[in-house]
Regions:
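N-terminal cysteine/histidine-rich coordination modules
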Residues: 1-78
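Arginine residue identity/basic-tract feature
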Residues: 4-5, 36-38, 57, 70, ...
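Weak global preference for isoleucine
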Residues: 6, 10, 27, 62, ...
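Serine/threonine-rich low-complexity intrinsically disordered regions
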Residues: 28-32, 85-86, 122, 176, ...
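Long C-terminal interaction/binding lobes of large macromolecular proteins
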Residues: 42-45, 90, 126-232
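Domain-exit/linker segments immediately C-terminal to small folded modules
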Residues: 48-133
Length: 232
């Protein structure tokens, strides 16, 4: 699938003048040279008013289709659905298997998913790892609230991965690294409890809320196992 774009009318919020902008609905880094960089650094979403020079970053639905690495990330601003089925895409790629398909609500999560899949990682396991480490970070910072967190570093040779969390009232960034053993443990939990999710069709929203549900089920399972042992 090559890139697809449409032209839309844009009204400048500063001067009120109307102009046009190219809006990309689908991009494929394997086909279009340089589009990956333009997507990740925000250039693809940049817009400048030709009348007054006001600059802004447009936010609109866009499908990032990386067939080389076999994943699709659908950025739909502020989407709150867990699952999105696109019949046209499902039919078009019905002969392809093992393609990870995700929906994300923000530009940062869009970039993170691309980084995760390009690194050859399982995003479900990454989300569970991120959640577990965020609890450690919160305790480390005296119970500070953790607002968001993103995978920001992965080094397989050094057996390390790192996350950047935004903490406290000022959303202060905090970088926390961890050994890959935590990720490996998370993957075992995911393989045990999320096997049904892995079989679902369409685009899935795998995020903190999803990870919290998996962690809750895991703790409940362990609690039941403990009670059963006491009864023996």
């Amino acid at each position: 699938m090559p890139e697809k774009k449409i032209t839309k009318a844009i009204v400048c919020p500063m001067c009120g003048e109307m102009s046009k902008a190219d809006v990309y609905t689908s991009i494929n880094p394997s086909v279009t040279k340089g589009v990956r960089r333009r997507a990740l650094d925000g250039e693809l979403f940049a817009w400048k008013c030709p009348s007054c020079g006001y600059s802004a970053r447009l936010t609109y639905p866009i499908l990032y289709n990386d067939m080389k690495n076999r994943f699709m990330v659908y950025f739909i601003p502020k989407i709150d659905h867990f699952q999105l089925c696109d019949k046209e895409l499902e039919e078009k790629y019905s002969n392809l298997r093992n393609i990870s398909k995700r929906i994300v609500p923000s530009f940062n999560s869009f970039k993170e998913k691309i980084f995760i899949f390009e690194s050859g990682l399982d995003d479900m396991s990454v989300e569970l790892t991120k959640l577990a480490i965020s609890q450690t970070v919160s305790k480390k910072l005296g119970g500070a609230e953790i607002h968001d967190g993103y995978l920001s570093m992965y080094d397989r040779e050094r057996n390390t991965m790192g996350f950047t969390y935004f903490t406290g009232e000022k959303h202060t960034p905090h970088v926390q690294t961890a050994r890959l053993e935590i990720y490996v443990k998370s993957k075992k939990i995911v393989d045990s409890l999320a096997y049904k999710d892995k079989k679902l069709k369409g685009f899935l929203k795998i995020d903190r809320e999803w990870a919290e549900n998996i962690l809750y089920r895991y703790k409940r399972m362990k609690h039941i196992e403990k009670l059963n042992k006491l009864k023996e």
